[in-house]
Amino acid sequence: MIPHTRGHPPEHALRAPGAAGTLIAVSPILFLVAAAHFFNDIYMGFFTPLFPIVMEKFGLTLSMVGAISMVTALASALSQPLFGMLFDRFGVTASLYLAPLLTAILVSFVGVIPSYPLFLAALFLGCLGSAAFHPKGASVTPTLSGSHPEIGMAIFSAGGNLGFAAGPAVIAFFISAWGFHSTPVLAVPAALVAGALFLLLPARELKARTAPAVRVTWKGLFANREDRAVLLRLVFINFCLTVAVRGLGTFLPVYMAKLSMPLTSIGVLFTVMLALGAAISVFVSSLSRRTGKRVLVLISVAAGAPLAVGGYLFFPGAAGSILIVLAGTVLTFSNPLLILMAQRHSGDSPAMASSLIMGFSWGLAGLAMVPLGGIGELIGLPGMMVIVGAFPLLAVLSCLRLPRG
């Protein structure tokens, strides 16, 4: 069940024509929350172009590079259901500004960390901050979205996707201009947004609107058999999609570095791919009101995999780069739809349901990076990346079994 704004939309709501001639009322606070999502996730996007640098600096193997993704998964993803249960039960809103601040401070110091163990420790703690933001951000978004939660969730998701997209280019150009040791400066923008949220966020109002009617528990979330089946399918679908996306983000930069491609090229490729996916997700979320969500999720799975495999087969080269950008776009545009579908089958636990999609399934995909790195060492990076690209096809049957609408 998604909590909706009751009564009239906020006085200063943004109004725009809807798909069916209706009006979309979105609270301006939603854009501030989306901005926090942008800066929360921009730091997570730093690591894509940094993998080759860190690999050389600390003398890492492919499996050890995969371990970085595993640490990210454990901290920022698998912990999200715990944060989701906490926020559903107590309605904590301070995480919307404290979490991005913690992430910014810890992750921005990667350039001055002297050892691999300390690097992993800082990454782990910084990713915990990122994890604390997502469940609450996703659960308050429908409340701030008026009568069109699909549009609101797309705006919220686009903030994170654009941040994750900007991360590779920002860190690549920053390091090229000022050096790896200057990265602590990058914590400043997130601190400013956190301060704005602290001053402007209507914390009491949001806490009241999103408070559950009953005590939130894991047992309660999975009490309904039909809802449980849908949630498990959604988790599996997002897991398969995320294996492809995380595999692309983890290992393709290493492959590009082996081909002597510059750091800025790596950053630009991933920024274009993720930014396009964020933009398309807003359109797709609006379109879902006409087509239903299931068909668009199926397109994301069934079309994204062939594009990814084709991109790997033709890379490097213009055709391969274009296919990879298209693959990343198609694989990620269904994320807001999956979150909303999970919330609608969550009872009184929207934050916990959101965390299953944004965190738990993402984390499981991160754990898969270590064995995939081992496979790459055995059969080579190109062969392993083809396997990664085809992975979403495992979710086709689960897509077909989702409820219509």
Annotate each predicted stretch with a short phrase.
Residues S79-G91, I280-G292, G376-E377:
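Helix-to-loop junctions at the C-terminal end of transmembrane segments
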Residues F47-T48, A229-T271, A278:
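Extracytoplasmic gate region of multi-pass secondary transporters
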Residues L78-P114:
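Conserved MFS/SLC helix-loop-helix module at the cytosolic interface between two early adjacent transmembrane helices
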Residues A94-S108, L296-G310, G389:
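Structural signature of the two symmetry-related core transmembrane helices
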Residues D348-I379:
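A late C-terminal transmembrane helix in Major Facilitator Superfamily
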